[in-house]
Amino acid sequence: HCKNLKVIGVLRGGMENVNVSYAESKGIKVFNTPGRNADSVADFTLGMILSEARNIAKGHLGLKNGEWIRTYPNSATIPDMPGRTVGLVGYGEIGRKVEKRLQGFETNVLVYDPYMKGEPVYGKKVDLDTLLKESDFVSLHARLTSENAKMIGARELSLMKPTAYFINTSRAGLVDESALYDALKSKKITGAALDVFEHEPPGIDYPLVTLPNVTITPHMAGGSQDAFFNTPKKLAKRMMDAGI
């Protein structure tokens, strides 16, 4: 119906909401904005790691409720960051920015990405099982596809250290939430920090929300003001670079 349409601009990295092949068959160029909120998500990921491992959000909530909480689910194993190993599942722009930021914390970095070419800038490229077994923090940064849906399930979680933390600021569909709930409930892993859920908003009775060893946020990792204002600029630059 849009006979004069020449260009479609997508203000996000993924183009799942556009039939790209059909558009291109009609001579319509499609542009997206990969990495539009990469800094925002990378910053937030580091915040989630620290918040869950050091009980920042839990301590804050306790004081707000008039409680002086000194004991937490991970009190016996609270870690410092130097010398710890962070495993990054996915090495797109967000994963690379998280890796760079982690250098300031003197951590070791492992990277798994089946589509990755070459080696990580700072970390070490490994297979997924090795990453899960050796990491103190496992952080997801992969795009959700039909091939990797629920790539983290009961088997994968069972490979993680009992002192490890699971971080997801990416997509809920990458994880089997029932398996994650079981792993956290049974303390097969120490904790998790989650910004995304299979059903949003999850509600106070949502299984993962009810657990004491989870830091939760309402899908806000990419929501910085800088990301909001920079996205149209990134899209415009991509179009201009293509001669539009």
Where are these regions (language model features)?
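Rossmann-like dinucleotide/phosphate-binding beta-alpha-beta segment
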Residues: 74-162
